[in-house]
């Protein structure tokens, strides 16, 4: 059979499985690919194909992640599944796989467990906007009342972390039985897919968001002015647009008088393009790497924020010793390092390599910042951790 052409017509959504070890995340991932492939096309993946997750690097951190894809009637999904708990923590904090929504897998036989709670908290901290629940292994529970109790417990847990526990779709099923071809449980997989389709809104595409370009380099071109280069992170820049230069110094206003790519002049540059932007009346020394160009009023510079961070273990090339309050590493945002002082949460004396923890950071220079911004923690150019801004303080 000839290979099918990849259809770009359906909107694309990123999801992933989260939940406690051995509650059936990988089995559910296999069931989704296998059962949806029968109806909507796509490739079925077996459990061991998914479980054998390849290593990848994100922000200098090695993570094992499996990527699969499947389709529903209206959408194309990319789905991530991780083999170990530490991989989930790293994946969610580094944003290696940005999720538009997560499928929380919880065993009906065991109910919510410590990692169920931890993954919900992480999802909240790193800004996963929607959670859908799959209660797995329901074939092992004969008592309908028990299923109801577990469902209530999951809803309460979601609500306690500011997710709308009462409204989150919860599908009761058995991934293993579905894989074995039990029609009633196969139906539950379709029910889960329908919940994904209806509950997670179609994500806004990067080009539709407000313009942002992290500055990588600055040149002065005689007779033309100052050019900054970088990759457009989101939105579109048109010739003639007013823009702001944000971060490290006072915010400056300027106008884009030219956009070029591969030495050709363009009318606009959009998300994903590596461009040079010509700035009217801006001096070479007023702009530097580490600032961003942005649509006016869409992003502001900040020095103080709360973050969720993962600290690399010694084996991963991280620190060999713990760090304490007032630790002062460099925080690498987008294209530059800024030194910052760390404050630990009340009752936390120190942070060991290999842990994930909430910290407050005060930078010595302001960075264009918003919730969800990812960063690396470095010491002398070596990555020792990764983090995500969970809230901006000042």
Swiss-Prot record:
The keyword Magnesium applies. GTP binds at residues 19-26, 81-85, 136-139. InterPro entries: EF-Tu_GTP-bd, EF-Tu_GTPase, EFTu-like_2, EFTU_2, G_TR_CS, P-loop_NTPase, Small_GTP-bd, T_Tr_GTP-bd_dom. It catalyses: GTP + H2O = GDP + phosphate + H(+). Residues 19-26 are annotated as: G1. Residues 174-176 are annotated as: G5. Residues 10-204 form the tr-type G domain. GO terms for biological process: translational elongation. Residues 60-64 are annotated as: G2. The keyword Metal-binding applies. SUPFAM superfamilies: EF-Tu/eEF-1alpha/eIF2-gamma C-terminal domain, P-loop containing nucleoside triphosphate hydrolases, Translation proteins. It is found in: Cytoplasm. GTP hydrolase that promotes the GTP-dependent binding of aminoacyl-tRNA to the A-site of ribosomes during protein biosynthesis. Present in outer membrane vesicle formulations which are used as vaccines in human. Monomer. PANTHER family: ELONGATION FACTOR TU, MITOCHONDRIAL (PTHR43721:SF22), ELONGATION FACTOR TU-RELATED (PTHR43721). This is Elongation factor Tu.
